[in-house]
């Protein structure tokens, strides 16, 4: 099962994207719908709200009078906390039920307006953000929903900023164009990334490596941090720390499109214990341990074809852990070492040219890895 988080600011067109994904076969779990469902007439949720805030929060027909509840529940922090203590567990329980009922091969899209505000992005295998400039969203709310402009501005100001949403976005869906323009983008995303991602997850197979072409990509640092956040949730207390390592950890250094991450653990047993959790987070286990300075207690690879990555789980204090932690810093500060790397990496790029997927990765590694082993011998005495 692939779990996708879908979010966007008010007026961005998130519901439109959700409908397209549903048409393509996704299972949609809409948090707004669930929030209404758990406080419908006759539910334990509504009964708990009445007990907490009084019967005057009910409409004449026995349903929840939302403005009346808001007047009481948002009066102060204590009242808001009381409201959340009632509704959040019920929403969480119902969400878990719906996800649990989905088929094993499902692509589950959780439509969550406050995904960023509630810190839920690392719980998802992938996050889609529907992106529209705030002024455009305000205009849409005023023209198409009849919201007063002052109210629209106030409500948007109370949500996460566009920059905060973009920071968690694995995929940014620009919906600022004409009606219907985003549909083709979503359909291509479904076919090229989401379906293969789910297939890889179900088969416990990492995605094929990315291109071996050397290039600088300003997005890699943010991409790595999103993966680090997911690995931190999956690793829990067993992960002492998680690092972006290797050439892609150096922002201005040309590198192939393969993020390298390292999870540092206390011992080999901890590495073994992470296997299932990392797999569920989108990082299936890989065979082998490697050798020498490139050895790891366990290797995992991203199942996402849109963001190739490898994850080495290494024991704290081992030579291979110390080398991986130090290499990026040395590449940043040692001009001579950078030139060495670039010379070898260009040779590896040439060797991999003409090959694709795993074959290209193997050809690249066959040139790069001996140099890394030699550098490790030089550096380990100093780190």
UniProtKB/Swiss-Prot annotation:
**Pathway listed for it?**
Cofactor biosynthesis; coenzyme A biosynthesis; CoA from (R)-pantothenate: step 5/5
Record GO biological process: coenzyme A biosynthetic process
- Catalysed reaction equations from the record: 3'-dephospho-CoA + ATP = ADP + CoA + H(+)
Quote the EC number: 2.7.1.24
Q: One GO molecular function term? A: dephospho-CoA kinase activity
Give me the Gene Ontology terms describing cellular component. cytoplasm
- The region called UPF0157 is annotated at 196-383
Q: What class of enzyme is it?
A: transferase
What UniProt keywords apply to this chain's record, in alphabetical order? ATP-binding, Coenzyme A biosynthesis, Cytoplasm, Kinase, Nucleotide-binding, Transferase
Question: DPCK domain: from which residue to which, for each copy?
Answer: 3-201
> Which locations, inside or outside the cell, does it occupy?
Cytoplasm
Q: List the disulfide bonds.
A: none
PROSITE patterns for this protein: DPCK (PS51219)
Record-listed ATP binding positions: 11-16
Give the family, as the similarity comment puts it: In the N-terminal section; belongs to the CoaE family. In the C-terminal section; belongs to the UPF0157 (GrpB) family.
- PANTHER family registered for this protein in UniProt: BIFUNCTIONAL COENZYME A SYNTHASE-RELATED, DEPHOSPHO-COA KINASE-RELATED
**Per the entry's comment, what about the domains?**
The C-terminal UPF0157 domain is involved in the proper folding of the full length enzyme.
Q: Which NCBIfam families match?
A: dephospho-CoA kinase, PRK03333.1
What this chain does, per the entry, is described as:
Catalyzes the phosphorylation of the 3'-hydroxyl group of dephosphocoenzyme A to form coenzyme A.
The protein here is known as: Dephospho-CoA kinase
> What organism is this sequence from?
Nocardia farcinica (strain IFM 10152)
């Amino acid at each position: 099962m692939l779990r996708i988080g879908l979010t966007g600011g008010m007026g961005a067109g998130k519901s439109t994207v959700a409908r397209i994904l549903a048409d393509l076969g996704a299972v949609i779990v809409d948090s707004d719908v669930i929030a209404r469902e758990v406080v419908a007439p006759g539910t334990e949720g509504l009964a708990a709200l009445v007990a907490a805030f009084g019967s005057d929060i009910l409409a004449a027909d026995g349903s929840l009078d939302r403005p009346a509840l808001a007047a009481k529940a948002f009066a102060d922090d204590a009242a808001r906390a009381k409201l959340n203590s009632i509704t959040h567990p019920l929403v969480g329980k119902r969400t878990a039920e719906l996800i649990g009922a989905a088929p094993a091969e499902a692509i589950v899209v959780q439509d969550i307006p406050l995904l960023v505000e509630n810190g839920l992005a690392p719980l998802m295998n992938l996050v889609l953000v529907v992106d529209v400039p705030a002024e455009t969203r305000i205009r849409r709310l005023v023209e198409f929903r009849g919201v007063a402009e002052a109210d629209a501005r106030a409500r948007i100001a109370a949500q996460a900023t566009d920059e905060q949403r973009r920071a968690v976005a694995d995929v940014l869906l620009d919906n600022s164009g004409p009606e219907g323009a985003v549909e083709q983008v979503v359909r291509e995303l479904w076919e090229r990334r989401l379906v293969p991602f789910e297939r890889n997850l179900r088969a416990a197979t990492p995605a094929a490596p990315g291109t071996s072409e050397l290039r600088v990509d300003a997005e890699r640092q943010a991409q790595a941090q999103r993966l680090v956040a997911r690995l931190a949730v999956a690793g829990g207390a067993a992960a002492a720390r998680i690092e972006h390592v290797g050439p892609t950890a150096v922002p201005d250094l040309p590198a192939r499109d393969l993020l390298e991450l390292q999870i540092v653990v206390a011992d080999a047993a901890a590495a073994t214990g992470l296997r299932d959790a990392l797999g569920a987070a989108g990082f299936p286990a890989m065979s082998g341990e490697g050798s020498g300075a490139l050895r790891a207690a366990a290797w995992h690879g991203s199942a996402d074809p849109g963001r190739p990555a490898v994850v080495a789980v290494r024991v704290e204090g081992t030579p291979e852990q110390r080398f991986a932690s130090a290499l990026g810093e040395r590449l940043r500060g040692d001009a001579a070492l950078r030139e060495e790397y670039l010379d070898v990496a260009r040779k590896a790029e040439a060797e991999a040219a003409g090959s694709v997927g795993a074959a290209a990765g193997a050809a690249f590694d066959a040139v790069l890895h001996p140099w890394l082993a030699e550098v490790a011998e030089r550096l380990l005495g100093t780190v």
